[in-house]
């Protein structure tokens, strides 16, 4: 029998989350230009979802200490859930793409070549840096984080990995597919030695919101 993978549901740390959210409110959201909003709404229109544009409001911190198992329907695309059961953990979600469809979708991916992603990553990095400084300079936060981890999160539930020592990553699953398509993908790799940004390499003027008209 081969075990292809497993993942625990994530349980994020209340203390670290509250600390990080305070820094999100301190840093604020990126200042979006008319071009940024125009591209976002054009993509949302194309995907037939509400044309809300890019986020301009910080959502309140939400969370529960106990979530019934039947409500746990989501998880990360990696082992972040397993990590969260071994050490106090949080993840940060900052507006760096366009809310226009399911994750891992072209509608989400296209913003990565635009100022939208650049701004979002910059602001998110500031929040992470401030949170790290808080944890390094305020030891009581670390104590509180571990207190929550030990006496709330793992009080009645202990982590056990589903993976055996002999289980290996299933990297063979896409071997043939990648051998076939990687040469085509390489044509689109960004070359920073020739272009200031990826849009310039692609020859796309920002923000292009409609398909250019073709001459008959």
Positions of predicted regions on the chain:
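Metal-dependent amide/peptide-bond hydrolase catalytic core
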Residues: 1-216
């Amino acid at each position: 029998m081969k075990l292809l993978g497993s993942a625990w549901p994530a349980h994020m740390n209340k203390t670290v989350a509250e600390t990080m959210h305070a820094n999100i409110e301190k840093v604020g959201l990126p200042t979006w230009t008319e071009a940024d909003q125009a591209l976002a709404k054009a993509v949302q229109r194309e995907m037939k979802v509400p044309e809300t544009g890019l986020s301009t409001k910080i959502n309140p911190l939400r969370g529960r200490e106990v979530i019934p198992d039947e409500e746990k329907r989501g998880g990360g695309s990696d082992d972040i859930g397993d990590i969260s059961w071994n050490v106090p953990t949080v993840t940060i979600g900052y507006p760096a793409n366009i809310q226009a469809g399911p994750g891992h979708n072209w509608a989400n991916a296209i913003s990565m070549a635009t100022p939208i992603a650049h701004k979002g990553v910059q602001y998110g990095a500031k929040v992470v840096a401030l949170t790290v400084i808080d944890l390094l300079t305020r030891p009581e936060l670390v104590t509180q984080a571990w207190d929550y981890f030990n006496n709330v999160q793992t009080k009645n539930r202990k982590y056990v990995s589903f993976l055996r020592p002999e289980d290996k990553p299933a990297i063979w699953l896409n071997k043939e597919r990648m051998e076939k398509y990687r040469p085509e993908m390489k044509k689109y790799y960004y070359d920073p030695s020739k272009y200031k940004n990826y849009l310039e390499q692609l020859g796309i003027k920002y923000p292009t919101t409609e398909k250019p008209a073709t001459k008959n």
